Amino acid sequence: MSQVLTTYETPVLPEWVDYNGHLRDAFYLLVFSYATDALMAHIGLDSQNRDASGHSLFTLECHLNFLHEVKEGARVEVRTQLLGHDRKRLHIHHALYLPGSGQALALSEQMLLHVSLDGPRSAPFEGEVLARVEALAEAHRALPVPEGVGRVIGLPPVR
C-alpha cells in the first residue's frame, strides 16, 4: 500500500463559509481534525479501543497552509500520509483535495502524541496499535515527502 490514505470526505456546508464566500479558516482545521480521527481508527485507536485501553492521541503542533479557495458545496477529501514516528509520536501530513484532483487546496502538518488518559501523560505505542503504526510507516516509507513539510513561518529579520 504505497499510497496515501483517503481519511475523510465531505461537502463544504453552508455554515462553514465566511463572508468572502469560501471555506472559513477554522473549518479547514475541523476537516483535518476529522481526518485525524479516521487515521486514529485506522491504527486501532477508534472510540471502542480508546475506551478499552485508556489511550488516545493528542495534537502537539499543527501547521496549516491555505493554497486555494474552497467554495460552498464543493466536495472535498483529505489524503493523509504518515511521515514518521517514534515510540510515542506520529508526524503526519494531511492534504485537502477535490476528489480526483491532483491540486492540493490546503495542507496540514501535525505532530501527535500517544497518551494514557489516566494522567493524561505520554505513553509508548503498544500491541496492535504499535503493529498498525509500524505497518503504515512501512507502507508510506517509499512515498515522497510532501512539499512544504518542515516549513517555518516567519519574516526575514529587520536590519
UniProtKB/Swiss-Prot annotation:
Disruption phenotype: Cells are incapable of growth on carnitine.
Catalytic activity: N,N,N-trimethylglycyl-CoA + H2O = glycine betaine + CoA + H(+)
Pathway(s) where this gene product acts: Amine and polyamine metabolism; carnitine metabolism
Keywords: Hydrolase
Listed GO biological process terms: carnitine catabolic process
GO molecular function: fatty acyl-CoA hydrolase activity
Keyword hit for Ligase: no
Superkingdom in the source lineage: Bacteria
Induction comment: Highly induced by carnitine via the CdhR transcriptional regulator. Not induced by glycine betaine or pyruvate.
Enzyme Commission code: 3.1.2.33
Keyword Nucleotide-binding in annotation: no
Signal peptide, first to last residue: none
Physiological role: Catalyzes the cleavage of betainyl-CoA (N,N,N-trimethylglycyl-CoA) into glycine betaine and coenzyme A. Is involved in a L-carnitine degradation pathway that allows P.aeruginosa to grow on L-carnitine as the sole source of carbon and nitrogen.
Family from the record: Belongs to the betainyl-CoA thioesterase family.
This protein's name: Betainyl-CoA thioesterase
Gene transcribed to yield this protein: cdhB
